[in-house]
């Protein structure tokens, strides 16, 4: 009897694990996004966009130049810009494939501040520059590595991580791959100080051991006031 119960529990856990994968598997070879349907008023929000007729698919649906264009991150709050591929805008052939790519431009001394991707793991490859990367796990252990051009690093799914251009004279460029077409991004500073509506000041004061004036100052510096 106990063996039968244990078997049912293990089977249930196995099925649950399958259902909790990042993105669902395709039932076809590909599902090129119908970008017209994606922008239509009242369009449904799905894990992936509606597909066009496979007979209408073209090679350029599976190609993009979106990541070839450099951006100027110098004027941004943290000195970084991230360009993410999107089935609706730049890479319709990636629809429902469970992946996205990103180009991160880092100004000299710029940083992608501590953040997480709740729905994806990330593999980051440095194309140019010297970039200090790292993540903290759920036991608050920190893993860091200084990467140079041609070197890569993996950020496990949902772990808080950062990328910091150590060079104060030259920019850096990083190319990332993520195993979800909708990885999400949650910046830690904004999650604490830029929510709408705002977190209560008392919560922030107690959590960070700061004063009410500190809360106001940080919110102002983050452009939240």
Swiss-Prot record:
> Which Cys pairs are S-S linked?
31-51
An example Gene Ontology molecular-function term: manganese ion binding
Gene Ontology CC: one annotated term: apoplast
Q: Mind telling me which SUPFAM superfamilies this protein's record contains?
A: RmlC-like cupins
Q: Please indicate if the UniProt record lists Metal-binding as a keyword.
A: yes
Q: Where is the signal peptide?
A: 1-22
Write down the glycosylated positions.
81
What keywords are assigned to this protein? Apoplast, Disulfide bond, Glycoprotein, Manganese, Metal-binding, Secreted, Signal
Q: Which residues cross the membrane?
A: none
Is Ribonucleoprotein one of the keywords? no
Where found in the cell?
Secreted, Extracellular space, Apoplast
Gene3D superfamilies in UniProt: Jelly Rolls
Q: Where does Mn(2+) bind?
A: 115, 117, 122, 161
Q: InterPro entries, per this entry?
A: Cupin_1, Germin, RmlC-like_jellyroll, RmlC_Cupin_sf
Q: What are the residue boundaries of the Cupin type-1 domain, all occurrences included? A: 65-216
- The protein's role, per its UniProt record: May play a role in plant defense. Probably has no oxalate oxidase activity even if the active site is conserved.
Assembly and oligomerization? Oligomer (believed to be a pentamer but probably hexamer).
Query: What does the sequence similarity comment in the record state about its family?
Result: Belongs to the germin family.
- By what name is this protein known? Germin-like protein 3-1
